[in-house]
């Protein structure tokens, strides 16, 4: 892709996520059946947090594209570094994680993650927008341009910190309301929940490492010299 095409692509995807972040909170806002969905805000759902994260990332990517064209430089240190850090440590791992875990649980027993009653409010296209297209967009981004990964120690630490923050949010929500964010937790005993969280982090960390490998496989010759310049 040319720089102009890449910029247009980032702009279109950015606006797609802006639309989703605006539209989804309005669904069934005054409907008593969706009261639990709206109570506590979007921060209790990893899927909705990810949509916000995607909007931020593609906004930064679009800004990076525009500034490079205006200034005429290949690299704008702070913006480009922020873009790459967001993508490598959060956007790629979390989007892939949501896709894998959601659809695995959905086809095993959808009541554990996405009860059938939600179909009345969230049409199929919106379900796929939240849980399927997110993977498509990050894979396109991986192929579209190289991303400079931090050290494994830093990358996994940042990912782990975000995992811990979200787990804390889930547990705090349960302690305040007695309701689990996702039905799957209600089917597990305390040990099962601990194991579930551990497995989720291991999966997230594995996805991070796979993303790094894919990036190196596709862009290794391009990325290496730039990474050496940072030293």
From Swiss-Prot:
Expression induction or repression: Up-regulated by androgen.
InterPro entries: ADTRP_AIG1 (IPR006838)
Keyword Electron transport included in the entry's annotation: no
Keyword set, alphabetical order: Cell membrane, Hydrolase, Lipid metabolism, Membrane, Transmembrane, Transmembrane helix
This enzyme's EC code(s): 3.1.-.-
Extracellular side: 29-45, 107-123, 173-190
Pfam families: Far-17a_AIG1
Tissue expression profile of the protein: Highly expressed in flank organs and weakly in testis and earlobes.
Cytoplasmic side: 1-7, 67-85, 145-154, 212-231
Catalytic function, reaction form: 9-hexadecanoyloxy-octadecanoate + H2O = 9-hydroxy-octadecanoate + hexadecanoate + H(+); 12-hexadecanoyloxy-octadecanoate + H2O = 12-hydroxyoctadecanoate + hexadecanoate + H(+); 9-(9Z-hexadecenoyloxy)-octadecanoate + H2O = (9Z)-hexadecenoate + 9-hydroxy-octadecanoate + H(+); 12-(9Z-hexadecenoyloxy)-octadecanoate + H2O = 12-hydroxyoctadecanoate + (9Z)-hexadecenoate + H(+)
GO cellular component entries: endomembrane system; plasma membrane
Transmembrane segments: 8-28, 46-66, 86-106, 124-144, 155-172, 191-211
One BP annotation, GO: lipid metabolic process
Topology of this chain in the membrane: Multi-pass membrane protein
Subcellular location: Cell membrane
A molecular function (GO) term: hydrolase activity
Site location (Important for catalytic activity): 47, 131
Cited function: Hydrolyzes bioactive fatty-acid esters of hydroxy-fatty acids (FAHFAs), but not other major classes of lipids. Shows a preference for FAHFAs with branching distal from the carboxylate head group of the lipids. Regulates the expression and the cell-associated anticoagulant activity of the inhibitor TFPI in endothelial cells (in vitro).
Family to which the UniProt record says this protein belongs: Belongs to the AIG1 family.
Further information: Expression was reduced after castration and reappeared after testosterone treatments.
Full protein name: Androgen-dependent TFPI-regulating protein
Taxonomic source organism: Mesocricetus auratus
Gene: ADTRP
């Amino acid at each position: 892709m040319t720089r102009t095409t890449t910029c247009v692509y980032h702009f279109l995807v950015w606006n797609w996520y802006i639309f989703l972040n605006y539209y989804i909170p309005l669904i069934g806002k005054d409907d008593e059946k969706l009261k639990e969905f709206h109570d506590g805000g979007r921060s209790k759902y990893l899927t909705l947090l990810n949509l916000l994260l995607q909007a931020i990332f593609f906004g930064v990517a679009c800004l990076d594209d525009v500034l490079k064209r205006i200034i005429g430089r290949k690299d704008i240190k702070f913006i480009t570094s922020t873009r790459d850090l967001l993508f490598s440590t959060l956007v790629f791992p979390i989007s892939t994680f949501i896709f894998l875990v959601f659809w695995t649980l959905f086809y095993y027993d959808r009541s554990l993650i996405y009860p059938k009653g939600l179909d009345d409010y969230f049409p199929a296209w919106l379900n796929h927008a939240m849980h399927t297209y997110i993977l498509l967009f990050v894979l396109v981004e991986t192929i579209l341009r190289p991303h400079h990964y931090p050290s494994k120690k830093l990358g996994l630490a940042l990912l782990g910190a975000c995992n811990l923050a979200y787990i804390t949010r889930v547990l705090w929500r349960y302690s305040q309301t007695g309701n689990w964010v996702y039905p799957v937790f209600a089917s597990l005993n305390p040990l099962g929940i601990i194991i579930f969280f551990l497995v989720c982090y291991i999966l997230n960390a594995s996805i991070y490492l796979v993303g790094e490998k894919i990036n190196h496989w596709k862009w290794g010759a391009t990325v290496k010299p730039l990474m050496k310049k940072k030293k």
